[in-house]
Every structure is written in C-alpha cells, then in structure tokens.
UniProtKB/Swiss-Prot annotation:
InterPro entries linked: CBS_C, CBS_dom, CBS_dom_sf, Cys_Synth/Cystath_Beta-Synth, Cysta_beta_synth, P-phosphate_BS, TrpB-like_PALP, TrpB-like_PALP_sf
Name used for this protein in its record: Cystathionine beta-synthase
EC number(s) per entry: 4.2.1.22
Pathway annotation from the record: Amino-acid biosynthesis; L-cysteine biosynthesis; L-cysteine from L-homocysteine and L-serine: step 1/2
Gene expressing this chain: CBS
Amino acid sequence: MPSETPQAEVGPTGCPHRSGPHSAKGSLEKGSPEDKEAKEPLWIRPDAPSRCTWQLGRPASESPHHHTAPAKSPKILPDILKKIGDTPMVRINKIGKKFGLKCELLAKCEFFNAGGSVKDRISLRMIEDAERDGTLKPGDTIIEPTSGNTGIGLALAAAVRGYRCIIVMPEKMSSEKVDVLRALGAEIVRTPTNARFDSPESHVGVAWRLKNEIPNSHILDQYRNASNPLAHYDTTADEILQQCDGKLDMLVASVGTGGTITGIARKLKEKCPGCRIIGVDPEGSILAEPEELNQTEQTTYEVEGIGYDFIPTVLDRTVVDKWFKSNDEEAFTFARMLIAQEGLLCGGSAGSTVAVAVKAAQELQEGQRCVVILPDSVRNYMTKFLSDRWMLQKGFLKEEDLTEKKPWWWHLRVQELGLSAPLTVLPTITCGHTIEILREKGFDQAPVVDEAGVILGMVTLGNMLSSLLAGKVQPSDQVGKVIYKQFKQIRLTDTLGRLSHILEMDHFALVVHEQIQYHSTGKSSQRQMVFGVVTAIDLLNFVAAQERDQK
C-alpha cells in the first residue's frame, strides 16, 4: 500500500504554536540549534492532504512500506504485545433476525486485543516502525493526542518497551480510560472538548506544545502516520478474509482517524472487489460524504473514539462506497443490546456500527455476509452508557424504563421550583468585576449571555480564581476568556428526578428554554435562552419546604 509522509507546514500556514522547535520524523539531521529551529516545524496539521500513492491494482512489490503478515500465537507468549491481533469473528444471532436481516451478520471483536481495542494494532505498529527506522530510541518520550484508546495501546507498549508516555485527551473521555492510562504509567493531560482541532487548547495543539518543550519526544501522530492504515491492511483485513474464507459482501466500520476503514477497505477492494464498504460517522462530525450528510446544528456528541471536525490525513474516503450518520441514542441502545442479547461486552461506537449495519444490510440476501467491526470494550464506559443514571441524565433512558420506587417529588416539573430570574453577565465584563459581582450577590456561578440573551457559556468563581492564580488570565481580561462550556442543561418541563440525577454529578444545572426567531429572509432559527440556574440547595430547600408545609 504505497504512501508518502506529507510535508510539514510551517510559518504563516495557520500554526497556533510559536513556543519553540521540535524534531519531527525525517527532520533528525544534526546541525546547530539555529539551523534546526529554522528547519523544523512547530506543528504538523492532522488534516494535511494525503500524498499516499496507493491505487487499486498496483502490485504490492511497488509499495515503499515494510509489510507484515498475521502470525499465529505460540502457546506461551514472550510478552503481552503478542496478544495484539488475531481477534475472533463472532456470529450475531439475535439482533440481525430482530431487524429482519436475511444475510449473515458477523462481528470482528477487536476488544479481544491486549489493551481492549482496535487501536492496540496501530499503537504497536507505529512504535515498531519508528524503532525500525531509528526515530524512536531507548529513553525517548512518546506523546500522542488521542480519544483514549490509542493512548491505552501506546501506554501498554511503552510500559513493555520502557518508554515514557504522555497522553493528551479531551475532557469528555471516560474516567475509566484515564484510570487505565494512569495504571499503565502514562502521564495524562486533559483539554477542552469543544476546542477546535487547530486551536492551541485542543488535544492536538497541546500535544505539539509539549513536543516542542520536551527533549527527545515524538508524536507518532495517528492522524498522519502511514503505519495506522498499514496495520489494518497487513493484519486486520487478512484476518477477516481468512475467517470468512474470502466470502463477504459488506463491511461496516465506524470512522475516527480513518485508519481502520482505509486499511481494511484497500485490502478488501484488492482481494474481494464485490464487497461494499460502509462508513459510519456520528452526527456532529464532518467525515461523511456527500457533504450534505454533515449538515446539522449539532456540534458535540457523547459517543467516543469516532468522528472529527477535520478530515485526518490517513482517511481515504474514496474506498468507502456509502456513508451513514449515527446518533448517540441509537449508539448506546444498540451497544446495550449487543451486551444483553449477544453477550458481546463492547463500547458505544460498536453500537453505532451495528445500528447502521442493520439498515445498510437490508439490501443483502440469504447466503450473503456482512461483517461489522466492534472497536473496543465496555470496560471504558462503566460509568457512562452502562450506567442507568448516566443514561437518564443524558436523556437516553426514560423514567418509566426503570422500576425502582421514587420519592413523592420525583415526577414534579422543574417549573415547580419557582426559580428567580438569574444573574447573568456579558462576555465583555472583566474577570475582576465578575468576581466582585458573584461575591456580592452570593453566587458561585453565572451564565454568560450576549446582548440578545443567547447563552454563550458559564463562568464559575472557582474556575476564574484558579485561572487567575495560574496566570492564564488577568483581572482586567474579559470574562469571555474563561467561559466554561461543559455544563448540564435542563428545561422547565423536565422532572425533578432528572434534575436530581444531574446534581449527583454536577454542582449546578442551567435551566433553558428555546425561542424560535424568524428572520427577514423568511427563515427561522432556534435560540436557547437562560431561564435560571438551579443547584442542589434549591432542590433540597424545595423538598424541605413542601414536607414542612404538609406537616
């Protein structure tokens, strides 16, 4: 599968980092520090155009890459890294019938890899290739921006091989991933979930800043590294072909960096040209084609490990025959279904994949076969979609789905609380002034709204004070610099039970209502307006007052 590493972009190409030099692969020549600083890029875009030269029908002998073949495991493994690959293919028996599929539905269970996910394959391959070409040396540091699974795979390999490992991941990723990474000895840096990939605060941006500051450190860069799709071209795809005796009619895979679907699809196009490749992209991501599929007001989603706000270099969308969009509710519903009905202990993105597969495979007939990739394990999501409380809090379960006895106030509406008008601040007010206002009024937090009253985010007293103490902002800076966008929203028509679930995990919830605004063009848009801020104290005071009145 021929490929070339894209050239780095430097200087006035939108680089958000100006903090110092680093050594990138292919830029390791010796010279003076001044020469190196002049030659080496401060960051490399993860969405640079691919320069891969792979073409269907081109002989493998023309590939510039080192290729490996799947190997059977010995009875006693020399180390745990030998338990990466050779994952089982399992028939899905009940779900396919439930949704009226005529074809055979099979699952490639990638959570049987040593680290629990499909990303173990690329993590090991990137390290082995970097060792082979001399980029990675004993004592070096591996840094990687990741949604967690690649980080776990790299941390696992780093623990065995003896490298220092730093993982940079967005805040939305599960606490289980963080705990596993720490147990493997990795250092973890968290970044804002809503930061654009090309901003200095994103997981990509922070990783490159660390790369610039830490000597002998390397970003293996799953977004650009040819080892990512090569791992799947050489092993995953061959395993699928062997397990299916070369007979499959459709493959469905959810897409993150795109390495899995690119590597597998390229091999299948060569060996099994009639097989249709189906890509799964979450709503709020922009990976799918045609572009119209990506048009939505939604920008965030709960499912982890798939979807991006940029097109990774390694993703070859030309090998995908058709794209489907998936949403959080069906992802988690199908993941729970796979666990409950098939005994497959998989993660949320597996739910996305199977939810799409039961739609896409409707066109297949008896005697045909559809393979789905189940990327990771439920281990990473014990406190998320596996938890009824979390599902209720996010609105993916309804109260009536659960049978436990509820207190008298559980089904009352939030509007019963009789909330007073909220204290709000404009984004142009200074941090110092905002702190004075919050202290004077006795509040710990306040919504930040624009002149029209539309919600921009939240500011909390604690966050502002910590930012001031850390020197990230000055008292004279506008409060817009410390807006906090990771907060829970609730509506007046929601139940106090749902509010209770939110307040078990969060200090407050923002009560919002929606307005439909018509424009002079005749089009309309929906705007969220703030109605109030509710805390656990508000709920407790309401319950206590009602019970006191009843007595």
